Amino acid sequence: VLLHTGYTDATLKQNPALWGASIPGITNEASVFLAGLKPMAVGADTWGLGAVPPRPGDKIFYDHVVLLKQHGIYILETMNTGRLADEGVHEFMFVLGQARLKGAVQMIINPVAMW
């Protein structure tokens, strides 16, 4: 599941301080819902998946707890989803090339969408 917000394209160059301080994202409830779909990965075009700051009553970065810790679902951040959104692509083959590192908690990846 990939989410396109347009936030990075609209904010990063014009206001990098704002881009680094806040992001639109999913709620705690949405994290649980998405986990129930049992995807291999959930990602977005923002530097985090959950909203920062979180909505009132939500826990910050709860998406990481639910998706990664509880369900083993990968989280993909700062994905370049603009072209997919611009062309109205909703289904595609997703190919992920990753570096061969052992014990890392973060990874630079080389994702490709084929449609």
What are the language-model segments listed below?
Residues 2-115:
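Active-/binding-site microenvironments in catalytic and ligand-binding cores
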